[in-house]
Amino acid sequence: MAEEGIAAGGVMDVNTALQEVLKTALIHDGLARGIREAAKALDKRQAHLCVLASNCDEPMYVKLVEALCAEHQINLIKVDDNKKLGEWVGLCKIDREGKPRKVVGCSCVVVKDYGKESQAKDVIEEYFKCKK
């Protein structure tokens, strides 16, 4: 997946890098999915990165996640769709053709463990350095 992004443009974009980081963290059991797990991980300062879906329909949910990230200086990145985020973090079934089915929406994901060093992780870290 990452190779496709690199080959096409020479440099990996943030969305592709985010997908790669989430996939690696999922493999290494380093993800907290959903508000309860995410809030616990953020509060214990175990989080390296937090991903929040912009189309979350619960304003208090968004406020809580943003406040915890701000309080503990944890990087927060927003994606536009919770279904897409759910697919990226493995909350779906994969059919025979390799296409995701029965995707469950996920409004918040916290990366507790990146799993391993990768170019995607470096792209994400560089993105946050530029934002500061």
Swiss-Prot record:
**Cellular localization per UniProt:** Cytoplasm; Nucleus, Nucleolus
UniProt GO cellular component terms: cytoplasm; cytosol; cytosolic ribosome; cytosolic small ribosomal subunit; Golgi apparatus; intracellular membrane-bounded organelle; membrane; nucleolus
Kindly state which keywords UniProt assigns to this record, in alphabetical order. Acetylation, Cytoplasm, Nucleus, Ribonucleoprotein, Ribosomal protein
Does Iron show up as a keyword for this record? Answer: no
GO MF, one example: structural constituent of ribosome
Self-association state and partner proteins as the record states: Part of the small subunit (SSU) processome, composed of more than 70 proteins and the RNA chaperone small nucleolar RNA (snoRNA) U3. Subunit of the 40S ribosomal complex.
Q: Which InterPro entries match?
A: Ribosomal_eL30-like_sf, Ribosomal_eL8/eL30/eS12/Gad45, Ribosomal_eS12, Ribosomal_eS12_CS
Q: Which family does it belong to?
A: Belongs to the eukaryotic ribosomal protein eS12 family.
Q: Which residues carry this modification: N-acetylalanine?
A: A2
Which species is this UniProt entry from?
Homo sapiens (Human)
Q: Tell me, which GO biological process terms does this entry list? A: cytoplasmic translation; maintenance of translational fidelity; positive regulation of canonical Wnt signaling pathway; ribosomal small subunit biogenesis; translation
Q: What is this protein called?
A: Small ribosomal subunit protein eS12
Q: Which domain of life is it from?
A: Eukaryota
Its function, per the record, reads:
Part of the small subunit (SSU) processome, first precursor of the small eukaryotic ribosomal subunit. During the assembly of the SSU processome in the nucleolus, many ribosome biogenesis factors, an RNA chaperone and ribosomal proteins associate with the nascent pre-rRNA and work in concert to generate RNA folding, modifications, rearrangements and cleavage as well as targeted degradation of pre-ribosomal RNA by the RNA exosome. Subunit of the 40S ribosomal complex.
State where it is primarily located. Answer: cytoplasm
Q: Which residues carry this modification: N6-succinyllysine?
A: K129
Per the record, a Pfam family?
A: Ribosomal_L7Ae
